[in-house]
Amino acid sequence: MEITDVRLRRVHTEGRMRAIASITMDHEFVVHDIRVIDGNNGLFVAMPSKRTPDGEFRDIAHPISSKTREKIQIAVINEYERVGEYEDAPNYEEAGAS
């Protein structure tokens, strides 16, 4: 499996979320709402999730292997850093509270 595209929307809010990404795998499957979070040990990727009735969060989609998780993390964070350097990049969109 290869990550063939990463789309990124930077988020400018007070919280730790820095961006929301969508990834395409093998030009055939897209996963939306992947979050880039600024954690205590640097940036990390959080998979899309929803809140259950009892208040817990459950992943909607997630990689099964650590190798695949690492591929996703590297691709998304690399795109986040690339877009940060070039605000006029074609995939750059700004999102967040006005």
UniProtKB/Swiss-Prot annotation:
Transmembrane segments in this chain: where? none
InterPro entries, from UniProt?
SpoVG, SpoVG_sf
Q: Which UniProt keywords apply?
A: Cell cycle, Cell division, Septation, Sporulation
- SUPFAM superfamilies, per this entry? SpoVG-like
Q: Which PANTHER family match?
A: SEPTATION PROTEIN SPOVG-RELATED (PTHR38429:SF1)
NCBIfam families assigned to the protein according to its UniProt record, in alphabetical order: PRK13259.1
For this chain, the family text in UniProt reads: Belongs to the SpoVG family.
Q: What does this protein do?
A: Essential for sporulation. Interferes with or is a negative regulator of the pathway leading to asymmetric septation.
* Name of protein: Putative septation protein SpoVG
Task: Point out the gene that encodes the protein.
Answer: spoVG
